[in-house]
Swiss-Prot record:
Keywords: ATP-binding, Hydrolase, Magnesium, Metal-binding, Nucleotide metabolism, Nucleotide-binding. Belongs to the ISN1 family. It catalyses: IMP + H2O = inosine + phosphate. Residues 328-350 are annotated as: Disordered. This is IMP-specific 5'-nucleotidase 1. The gene is ISN1.
Amino acid sequence: MTTRYRVEYALKTHRRDQFIEWVKGLLAVPFVLYSQPTGVFGDGPSVTQMAEEAHRRYAEIMRDVELMIDDHISRQQDDSMFPSKLRMLIPTAGPFFTRLPLEAAFKYQDRKRYISSRRFVAPSFNDVRQILNSAQSMAVTNGSLQLATFDGDVTLYDDGFNLEPTSPVIPRLLDLLRKNIKIGIVTAAGYTSADRYYERLHGLLDAIAESTDLDPVQKQSIIIMGGEANYLFEYSPSSPCKLAPVPRTQWLTPEMASWSDADITRLLDVAENALRDCVNNLNLPAMIMRKDRAVGIIPKTPGTRIARESLEETVLVVQRILELSSLGSSEERPTKHRPSSPPIPPSVASQSRRVPFCAFNGGNDVFVDIGDKSWGVTVCQQWFGSKENGGAIRGENTLHVGDQFLSAGSNDFKARSVGTTAWIASPAETVELLDELADMMQKKLS
């Protein structure tokens, strides 16, 4: 029984998104009932009828899920002591900051992906993920999108590469700035100097500096949050690197300021020992790298690849050890949350005295950072909100775009607790998402 538990939970559940898997399971029923794998493509009327019926049933299911989310949101807003039906079906369901027009989003994606016309391949994880992205895009454009935050690697540029001047994502980001939407790049890269971030983002920063249709205020509407939530840089046209560091005293939230340096050091010491044990026990070709606000393992020699399973094992081991210690907190969301109120990072609600951390798989390394992206996005919300109206940009007015949303070893996951999110799988998908947003904004204006 113990072995089965470990296999089913420790090695599988952390690689799934329970909400997406649940929706995918709902859509599997009409696929089985209405698909015609025994037909032939020459049988036009039969295939057309099948697609129409499957489309109708898929749309009905998405509408039913949409209504369940509405009920979940109403109970969030009322702080109801009784769980919603959605929460009973999916205990991990987090806060929703906006309605999700899933029926409309499905119809939109069905026109692009022809989900209803497929006879051999059921609606997939990626189909549902794209439907949710479209629904969230529709929701934030129906409201007022004020802040868009982005991960770096795999979101804005390929893993290990830089944001070059030829990148198609750059004109889309400039378009957001023209629309007076603030941009925060919230990356795990923990550089302490501006020149390293300029090296990674020079294509975008140079494009902003050279732009003739962005006013000075719009050019200042971008910040870089490095090391998850540890280093803030603002745009500076007079700097050779186009960035200037912002002292922590100017942007730390009161909760973040309460984390003592001694506790941070002790947490990183425990994490370093756990990482060292993993390197020895798994015989990893890796070495320890210690920074002032992070510790991790990287390959001993460039070009060496570490097995994905070994990286995941390391993340789960280190995370568990830190959670069991008296120092670290990796809570995923607050126990109470009103989506209409300023977002509260997850560890505040229950363990404000413990230091939040994020253990994540970087693709070929593992790092433990102080804080996580919920705090990084929160800093962006407060930084821009305080300049506009003295408050914080709300979760329903924030969209975080990233590629790592699985529940363990993924550092975008925590951002779900402080704003709306879009889950992409490549820079090309980011471009597609931004085009989708721009199109929806244009339709709203017209």
